[in-house]
Amino acid sequence: MAQVGDKLPNVNITVIDKEGQKSVAANEYFAGKKAVLFALPGAFTPTCSETHLPGFVVHYDDITGKGVDAVACLSVNDAFVMKAWQDTQNAEKIAMVADGGGALTKALDLVLDTADFGGTRSRRYSMILDDGVITHLNLEKGGDFEVSGADTILKQLG
């Protein structure tokens, strides 16, 4: 399982950000950046849409004001779903990471098995990355939403 000190692996993700949509290795996308990556079980789901993503949208300027170069949201959904969700959530400043086949989620060993809900999903978490290395990891238990929100990240950034 991912832990502080680990480097993001060389697995492909699709990123939708201000530069458009691109397929890129996770370690390459986050290289040379101080970044926040948060993950959630699914786009358009209640907690993810009502609380988790909106918190990062509201606090985006506060987070980037603390020296963060990128704020990214990961879900095991395809790029079309992530783009549609970005649009409906007014989250254009947030880089949406479509981990369609779950390659990054599996490589980090942060899989949430929701067979009855939608198959393999990501556990809910947030992390701070420095040049692709995890410096802080806030991992939720089960379906909880207690420690992975924007408020926690802001406290950790100081």
Describe each PLM feature range.
Residues 1-158:
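Chalcogenol-based redox active-site neighborhoods
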